[in-house]
A protein has these predicted regions:
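C-terminal catalytic/acceptor-binding lobe
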Residues: 6-9, 18-22, 191-193, 197-312
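Hydrophobic beta-strand segments of well-ordered beta-sheets in folded domains
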Residues: 8-12, 33-39, 57-59, 148-152, ...
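Short, well-formed alpha-helical segments that are part of the catalytic scaffolds
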Residues: 10-36, 44-51
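Short, solvent-exposed loop/turn segments at secondary-structure junctions
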Residues: 18, 44, 66, 110-112, ...
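A short acidic (Asp/Glu
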Residues: 22-25, 48-51, 115-119, 162-167, ...
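Active-site-proximal specificity loops/subdomain of glycosyltransferases
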Residues: 42-107, 112-125
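A structural signal for short, well-ordered beta-strand segments and their strand-loop junctions
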Residues: 103-108, 150-155, 210-214, 255-258
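Conserved catalytic core of nucleotide-sugar-dependent glycosyltransferases
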Residues: 112-197, 201, 311
């Protein structure tokens, strides 16, 4: 297929401090036939362990150069605080573009498996054959290419993966991202924390579109249970600060809530999505007519005069 030639289905696993890389292990276990790599920064102290274990699959970017153009949405610097995932996400986009790809996948490094809705069995089933995952992801990537989607993906194995929701979609991509590799369509990632929500906010309010399908799912390790990555930052600063970055990005649409036994964010996507308006509101049609001037009855005027004289 044309999109297959353009290369839209390569997986890049973004990882730091986790050289065993559960996602890579999972892809090997199911014998995934497609191309995949692990992307690490040159600031990672465990980089030699990655290279020893995964060899040429490890791609290294210059983290020190990347942070000079990273917008963390704060002034905390990089000496005491981790940079977050934005440097590696933006660097991965450039790596993919330089390799001649039209689109690419960005995965986290803690995936334990994948499930998919089976029409024959009428339920979600575990994917044990990597070829099934490859074909399912290729269909999503090809759709993203044809529709010029700025982000498209699939959901985590949570309540969103319930079989009843298999034909619905989510208005944002939480984890498995299929992104454009060319700078004309790619929306740069910003924010030290909560970068996935902020990226969705920036896509939607610029008139773009992103979505997650719910018939393909990721089985993942318990949140903040894996060492490395962003776990230490979340444990030290809490998820309330994570929500704060979302509020900074869209204060009218994001708020702090308490759910899943922790502080979390809630986003009113309806306040961010572009809306189709009636032609009568078009600027070419001019502004709506001014309302008629209010007229006062004689009785009200007489009463006003009475009070005015009394005050004088």
């Amino acid at each position: 297929m044309t999109t297959d030639i353009l290369r839209v289905n390569t997986i890049y696993i973004i990882s730091k401090g986790r050289p065993r890389c559960r996602t890579a292990q999972t892809l090997e276990r199911i014998r995934y036939p497609g191309e995949w790599h692990i992307v690490c920064g040159n600031n990672d102290e465990t980089l030699p362990q990655y290279q020893e274990r995964w060899g040429e699959r490890v791609l290294v970017f210059d983290w020190h150069d990347e942070i000079t153009r990273t917008d963390t949405m704060d002034n905390l610097g990089f000496e005491k605080y981790p940079s977050g995932a934005c440097p590696v996400r933006n660097a991965t986009r450039r790596i993919s573009d330089e390799r001649g790809e039209a689109r690419h996948w960005q995965f986290d490094d803690d995936y334990l498996g994948f499930t998919i809705w089976s029409r024959e069995l009428g339920k979600n089933v575990v994917i044990s054959d990597g070829a099934i995952l490859y074909e399912a992801m290729l269909k999503i990537a090809e759709f993203g290419y044809r529709a010029r989607m700025q982000n498209v993906g699939f959901v985590l194995d949570t309540m969103e993966s319930h079989p009843e929701q298999r034909y619905t979609f989510s208005p944002r991509v939480f984890n498995a991202h299929n992104l454009p590799s060319t700078p004309d369509l790619f929306v740069p990632w910003v924010g030290r924390m909560n970068d996935d929500i902020i990226n969705a906010i920036n896509i939607w309010r610029r008139g773009g579109y992103e979505m997650s399908v719910k018939y393909l799912h990721i089985e993942f390790a318990k949140t903040q249970s894996e060492p490395g990555g962003m776990t230490d930052l979340y444990r030290n600063d809490g998820t309330a600060r994570k929500t704060a970055y979302g509020i900074l990005a869209a204060p009218s649409a994001v708020k702090l809530v308490f759910r899943f036994e922790r502080y979390h964010h809630a986003t009113a996507w309806g306040k961010l999505r572009p809306k189709l308006l009636d032609e009568k509101w078009s600027r070419e049609s001019g502004p709506p007519p001014a309302p008629p001037k209010q007229t006062h009855s004689l009785a009200k005027s007489a009463l006003a005069d009475k009070w005015r004289k009394a005050l004088l």
